[in-house]
Amino acid sequence: MTGKPARLGRWVVLLFVALVAGVPGEPPNAAGARGVIGDAQCRGDSAGVVSVPGVLVPFYLGMTSMGVCMIAHVYQICQRALAAGSA
């Protein structure tokens, strides 16, 4: 695969990796980490604790998949429109 779709695919993968990886050197569950808004922290006991990567990775996978599909459809529509216009 060469050209613009391959370049776009590389950018999508790079964006996905950047979103999943998070901030380099960020300690998990540290004060001031993501998931804490101001001084509000959830200190109550919960029935089940779900890790942030356990929630975010499937979310980002789904969003990336949907974005790639939408871009592919728009690309095909534009190709067909340009082909019909030049014929």
UniProtKB/Swiss-Prot annotation:
Residues 73-87 are intravirion. The keyword Metal-binding does not apply. Residues 26-51 are virion surface. Interacts (via N-terminus) with gM (via N-terminus). The gM-gN heterodimer forms the gCII complex. Residues 1-25 form the signal peptide. This is Envelope glycoprotein N. Envelope glycoprotein necessary for proper maturation of gM and modulation of its membrane fusion activity. Also plays a critical role in virion morphogenesis.
